[in-house]
Amino acid sequence: MVNITDKSKCCGCNACGDVCIHQAIKFHIDVEGFWYPEVDKDKCTDCGLCEKVCPIINTEDWHESGGFEKPHCYALINKNIEVRFDSTSGGAFSALADEIYKKSGYVGGAIYNEDWSVSQFLSSSREDLSRLRSSKYLQSHLDGFYIAVREALKTGKPVLVCGSPCQMAAMKRFLRKPYENLMVVDYICRGIASPLYFKQFINYLEQKHHSTVVYYKAKSKELGWRTLSTRVEFANKDVDYILGKENPWLSMQYKIPEVCRPSCFDCPFKGFPRTSDLTIGDLWSSPGSIPKELDSDIGTSVVFANNEKGADMLNKCKKKIIWSDFSFEEATKGNYHLMYSLKHSEHNREDFFKTLNISFQACIDKYMPDFGQTQKSLKEKIKNVACFIKGVTGAAGWNIGTWIKNMRYNLFCRQIETDILERKFIIINKYCTLDLHPKAKLVLNAPFIMGYKRIKGSKLESRLLIEENGRMEIKYGSYTVYYGADIQVFKGAHLEIGGDASVNVGLNLICANHISIGRWTGGGRNVTIRDNNGEHHISIRGYKTSIPIVIKEHVWLTENCTIMPGTTIEAGAIISARSVVQGHVPSFSIVSGDPAKVIETKVYWLSLIHISEPTRR
């Protein structure tokens, strides 16, 4: 019988529980959130099946026989852009699953449960594919999964199963014999994180937003695949985009790999040959190595065909994919954990999980106390000064007056809060006019580029007016306003801009009350945003001359659109050209017309405007 005395010798695959016909094995969840088998000795007949099925005990013979000496390696994307957006990388799994569904077969993979735990699920309907695709990044329960797969195989229909390398090794042990109608797919696994770790992170997010999480996408593509951003949606309609470098859940895993299962630190399932027919994952490689037609920053898959069966399966999917041979050496170099196990950090595992059981915030406070702070090193400060000088040089050229204006407003203007060493400055191009009341305030937490010119010789003026007690803030990232802009913040009004975006020629922004523009929200040409009607009074019940505007994160304001007073635009929306918007715009929708109406829903789009460094302009 199985007897776990060393937790590093159990991968939590659940195969021993499924193979026991006497139901003598149950799984106990420890303080780390991982499960381990416990044997009821009164039910156990000591038949030894649980030991025979264990992939850890039987590491010497789990490798696939008859495989390629060196796997065939491919870069791959799904032709369906919606599938690619919804996938973790390039949509390889969905292409494989589609081929199986087309033959009325079964597809197995991981799905979220209502409590945000994860289970392996065997599906016979293509409608389940959206739940099955995308990596979940925590350990999944497989109770009953092996039995379900065995029964599906007996029907003679094709079956595809996808899981971690240890789970798929366990599948081979459980089935005992090869099945021609079985396609086994594993993924590149760094190490499997504790379900408790993820649960506490969800609790942390829910406390932060005062609402329950209703949708979670670990790797969202809207801000670019390489940003490793996460999108979380809440019951109160909040949407939170979290960049990888700003995500405590991701950062803590790299700082403290002990969040992963003990067996992950000496994993016998690394490298090649594999137990699977196909291995899939993200194609991380050196810049320029991925063919351009396969790389548009919305995800590219790497696929290893480990044997002839896997290669044949890929060939059957060729109508659904765009693929190209890729260097095996390049692919393995970019995916370190394809070949090597996790390494322990200096942190005490027991202490970490004691803290995690208190709360996720307690872990941040103890292990990453500086997380989210913007304190810069000396090297970074020198880079920031160089960035400022380069930005001013590009804006002013040899124009002494523009140089003086930049120095004055950055170093000697009390109305503008700047700190060049901390990368908080304004870059003023030629033909820009600033009119700041002595009691006005412009608060810069990131670079603000005013009057940027694509046509260098243009004399098109840009204007910024902030009246008495008016306040304008650039909150998070660099914000670029092209030439021809007219920004006016009236007496006592408040304009806040998230940044990490740019707005094209001819912006007309009038703030008399309060306008909030979220991060990664930019605009096309001649966009108008105004929260007031110029003090004109109309005899309509409920009419107000000024009503605040809220534009949330990752919104696309296209050419000549107008945002009227009282408008709220939820995250991810697109405002079509020449639309006039007043009222509420739902998340991830496209609106068009005058007045604007919803014409599309559940639309996701890639934003490149978050790359708005002044030195790139």
Regions found by a protein language model. Give the residues of each.
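Iron-sulfur cluster-binding cysteine motifs and their immediate structural context
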Residues: V2-I4, K9, A15-E32, Y36-E38, ...
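Short, flexible loop segments at boundaries between secondary-structure elements
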Residues: M183-Y204
